[in-house]
Amino acid sequence: MALKTFKPVTPSLRQLVIVDRSELYKGKPVKALTEGKISSGGRNNLGRVTVRFRGGGHKRTLRNVDFKRREHAGKVGTVERIEYDPNRTAFIALVTYEGGAQSYILAPQRVKAGDKVVSGDSVDIKPGNAMPIGNMPVGTIVHNVELKIGKGGAIARSAGNYAQIVGRDQGYVTLRLNSGEQRLVHGQCYATVGAVSNPDHMNISLGKAGRKRWLGRRPHNRGVAMNPIDHPHGGGEGRTSGGRHPVTPWGFPTKGKKTRSNKRTDTFIVSSRHNRKK
């Protein structure tokens, strides 16, 4: 889908660039595949703010998206329509399987209403089909990749995202991610062929602060603009750079500080995403 720009009849329209969603389905989602979603406003179960600068925004209905693609394995599904989902950057596709069962899946690029999709151990290599990643040829573009067998897709799920199979060895597949990282994934983990829809999402410009508020994002004020009581970067006469390496409001290093602590899975990372920056 293309991008939309507007004549600058108002200041906010001058900068506005959004994705043209005129081809998407304009009705409501399938009620059986949805559930209510209560906005947390960035608060936890104690009512304390755990994520700053969140709150407000439009009320959303949660669409139950099938990330596993195993329940209807072997059944041919027909894409009924492509829909907008307010809970993610990608579009979703409503699929009706043989027997009448329906589910939502992440809509891949170049998949449209009327197309057939299927999942199973040995299916055709075409966008929208899901199978164990070990059964795909080297060079295949994939998305919605599982990290644990049967747990559901975890890698390459956002708009325009994908990973590429670059090798295969001893039951594991080597994937190259968009970040540059190369990672081992078990060959029995499911993945879907193709790239995720809505690749133009990266080019949008919201044009005004209010549009960010509609998405549930509140103003993000900088530490250097605060008083010393409120932030380690606060205070000083006139504009300052903070006077120290960037830290969080609680004094922990940030902006470049490595935070990965899951050493148990380090063995699956063949090449770190940081290597290409050296």
Swiss-Prot record:
One of its GO terms (cellular component) is large ribosomal subunit. The keyword Metal-binding does not apply. SMART domains: Ribosomal_L2, Ribosomal_L2_C. Keywords: Ribonucleoprotein, Ribosomal protein, RNA-binding, rRNA-binding. Gene3D superfamilies: 2.30.30.30, Nucleic acid-binding proteins, Ribosomal protein L2, domain 3. GO terms for biological process: cytoplasmic translation. The keyword Ubl conjugation does not apply. PROSITE patterns: RIBOSOMAL_L2 (PS00467). Pfam families: Ribosomal_L2 (PF00181), Ribosomal_L2_C (PF03947). Signal peptide: none annotated. One of the primary rRNA binding proteins. Required for association of the 30S and 50S subunits to form the 70S ribosome, for tRNA binding and peptide bond formation. It has been suggested to have peptidyltransferase activity; this is somewhat controversial. Makes several contacts with the 16S rRNA in the 70S ribosome. This is Large ribosomal subunit protein uL2. It comes from Methylobacterium nodulans (strain LMG 21967 / CNCM I-2342 / ORS 2060).
